[in-house]
Amino acid sequence: MNNTEFHELVDEKLQLIEDMIDDSGADIEPVITGNVLTLEFENRSQIVINKQEPMHEIWLASKSGGFHFSYVDEKWTCSKTGMEFIEMVKEECQKHADEEIEWA
């Protein structure tokens, strides 16, 4: 994968996260600054998601720790847990919000 393809794939996922949050009605504020998407919660906690272009990875930092995702078999998979990226984002959002979120 080249850098252009990497950015297109990651941007698609970041937009999906924003859309999912909007559709859920959860009190989460997504803020994009450069290559970083920060999800800010009512309790002032944050999830930080960023593009790591040199490694072609997505990194996610939350109160559960730091996670790296690589694009394998057409999906972003965590090197530590084997979990798919969007599923982990949903799980971490629920932990940070301290409530069940109704994902569309």
From Swiss-Prot:
InterPro entries membership: CyaY, Frataxin/CyaY, Frataxin/CyaY_sf, Frataxin_CS
Gene Ontology terms: biological process: iron-sulfur cluster assembly
Domain of life, source organism: Bacteria
GO cellular component: cytosol
Role according to the record: Involved in iron-sulfur (Fe-S) cluster assembly. May act as a regulator of Fe-S biogenesis.
Family to which this protein belongs: Belongs to the frataxin family.
Protein name as catalogued: Iron-sulfur cluster assembly protein CyaY
Organism of provenance: Aliivibrio fischeri (strain ATCC 700601 / ES114)
Gene: cyaY
